[in-house]
Each structure stands twice: as structure tokens, then as C-alpha cells.
Amino acid sequence: MTLNHRVPTGVISLDENIQGGLPGGSMTLVAGNPGTGKTLLSGEFLHHGAELRENGLYVSLSEGRESFLEYMRRVGKDMTSPPASDHVDILDLLTVKEAGIDNLMEIILERIEEGGAERLVLDSFSSLANAYPEAIDVRVSLHILSKLVRSIGCTTLLVAEIPSGRETIGLGLEEFIVDGIITLRRRTRNGDMLRELEITKMRGTEIGQPTQLFTLHGGFNVLPPFAETPITNPARFRHIPDQPERLSTGHEQLDSILGGFRRGDTILIELGEDIPSLILGLLVGTMRANFITGGGGVLMIPPGGESVERITRLDERFGLTEEERGRLLRIAVMRPEERPPPYVINVDPDDIKKSVRTWDDEKTRLLATTGKPILKIAYIDKAYSLWPMEHTKRALDVESMLTKAEGGLLVLLVRPGSEDLARHSSNISGAHLSLTNEQGVILFRGIRPRTQLYALEMNGDGGYPRLRFTPIR
């Protein structure tokens, strides 16, 4: 085993987490219950090796050659076409188990040497281990295999099945011989399925995160913690047209997921702990940009601690101009600058009636100026911190009814600690969305309408910041 030489698995965020890949010539156990993605991870490992012109050997002891090929084909990895067909050898031993376990090991060792394998997958090692009458025989054979692959620098994955209903590997002896152990799990969270990868052992490796989330959407993909992505070739936000009965979210993917929002709808976005401000900026900022680039007005109450300057900086990244902001945007603040820009309005933190009148006056001006429905965005826990709960609820009820008549959108955002207000807001909302933080990965789901779980990542390919919604499957 060569600690300084790293063999990338091809799963980018996994490789980044283990110093660039598996130690060269190492032997790693990949364990999990049925359906957790063990074979897919192993196939990605071999396919990526083929892309690097490294020879690989897949030894099938459980499902057979055709099942493996079809499984990989479904995620866009054709193992029968170059480069995989040139560099990956598939040894199907399902039909020759009757030859005896010693003969099986001899066949495997010969094929490794003949093909000059640099990557090896044994799927599954559990099937091989169960064929031995004694546990000591498993250890002896594993020692022989380990000695060979290390001597030729062949990096090996041993796939092990954890029986359904159990969480431990259960084979015992081999866990002391292997250099690394990666365990794949599924768990349920608020009715949604999450997939987790845990690295419990990786000899000679600094592990960034012991546990990572992953998805099987489009292959085996480990989800990175949310991070800002640089924008190359800046461009103006591209407006997404509205439909006769529905308004665009400003996100093509989110429009596909939700079908847009009904005209006149109130939308509640419930926020969990530790949601980065950039996520919120991209989610509602994109809605804001879509309204403004379509000539519609936007009226908003930002969250506490969010400056007008930060909001306008994001608008500039969308390509919005100062003229557009002055004409189409109104940001309500409690204590504005001495000479605020034209898009900043003052609301009185001590007088809810006066604040509502100011809000209504600006809304009337925007409706008259644009001749179009407007987008209203409010962080309602900020209002609750200033005004009595019953007054805040009454103001929300009235604004929700007015929004239906106006045909625009009212987006309400609520942070943890305002559960009573969140329940009330959910009752008046046509759509209820949720954002949570799980190990640094920001998860999105629709509560109403019900959607599957998505991981959010920043995408700057189009010339301006956008969110990418990756299904958790």
C-alpha cells in the first residue's frame, strides 16, 4: 500500500474528503444493507479507472454479469463501450461455484495477474466468505489476496452485505485485515429517505467528514456541504415567462418540481437551523429578479441583520440596474440611512398601523406604475419580534386575502423559534416549503405540494448565481 499515491474513486466529493482518493494498493471494505448503492459505487470506481486508462477487474459472485451491466447502464455508465470495454474485465463466477472455494480463489488470482489489474472489485465478499466452512479459512484466503494486490499495487474494493434489519457487518475477521471501511446506510427523516456514507476506517488518511450524504441520482454522487461557486462570464438574469394561471419561481428546475405558483398564492418557506444567508438570497432573490426583469414590482421586508447593501449586491450579480431598483423595488427597513436610495422605505417599529399604511401606499404605487401583479417577500419572525402576535397574524391574514385579489405572490419566511406563527402562516398558505441543514448539505422539500427531497447547490454556469436541485434517490 502506498499512502502518498492516491487512487481516485471518481466520486468527486468522496475523493476530496479522503485526500484525493483511496491509498494506492489498499483494500477497502464497502458494506451496507441491500439497495444502499454498494455495487454502483464499485462500478463508478472501475469506470473512472477506465477513463484514466487503468485496468480493472469486476468479480461477480452474487448477481451476475448481465445484472451488473444493466445496473450501470441505467445510470449512464456503459461498461460494454470504450473506455470501460477496453480496460474493465468482468469475471462472472456465479455459475462456477460448484468448482469449490479453493478453485474460485485460484481463478480470481490468475485473472488479476493475467489482466494486470490495477483496480479490483469483489462483489460480494460476503458470498465468498459464506462458502468457507470455518472463519479461519476466510482470514487465510483474505491474507493471500491482500498480499497479492498489495505487491502489484492493485487497489481493491470488497463488497459486503449487511443483512436487512442489522447495522453491523458481522463477518468479523476481515475488518482487521482491510485498510479501509466504508459503510452505506439509508435512514428516514421526517418521512424522507436520506442516504449516508460513513468512513469508519481509512489507514493513513485524514478524513474530512466521517459521514457524508449521497444520492444515487445519475450515479453514485456524494453531496458536498453548500458552498459559493465562482461566476465566470457574468451575464444578465434570463427572465422566465409566466403562464396564464401560474407565476414562475424564477428557477427552471423549481418550476418543473412545483409547476410554478398559482397567481394570488401565499407561499410559506419554513427555515431550519443554520441556513446560509446566500441560500435564502438565491432562493427568493431569483424570484425577485424574475419579477423585475419581467417588469413587475417587488416589495420586501428583509430579515434582521440583512443589509440593503447585501441585497443590492446580489441584484447586481443578476444584472439588475440601479434604475430598475429605483422603479420596481421597495425594501422596508426600520431605521434607514439619512439619505436612503429611492428603493428604501421606512416602517415604524413602534406603530404597526402606520407601518401597514406605508406598506399599502408603496404597494399601490408599484401596482399603478407597472400595471402588473407584484411580489411581496416578508421575514415574518422579524415582524413578530416588534409587534404583538395577534396584530401580526391579523396583518398576515389581510395581506394574504389582498394578494388573492391582486393576483401576485406573497412569500413568507419564518425561522426557528416562531412555531406558532409558522402554523398560522401554513394555514393561510397555498404552498408550504421547507429548508433544513443536514451535515452542511441544505435540503429542500415541498410539504404542500408534497415533493421528494432535494439537495441544493450553487450553480454559476449561466453567468449568474442559481440553485441546482439534486434529487435524493
Regions found by a protein language model. Give the residues of each.
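Charged, amphipathic alpha-helical linker segments immediately N-terminal to NTP-binding catalytic cores
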Residues: 1-2, 206-243
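Pre-Walker A adenine-sensing motif
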Residues: 9-21, 249-261
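Short hydrophobic/aromatic beta-strand immediately N-terminal to the Walker A/P-loop
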Residues: 27-31, 266-272
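Loop/turn-to-beta-strand initiation segments
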Residues: 55, 87, 116-119, 151-159, ...
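Phosphate-binding/switch loop-helix module in NTP-utilizing enzymes
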Residues: 93-150, 338-401
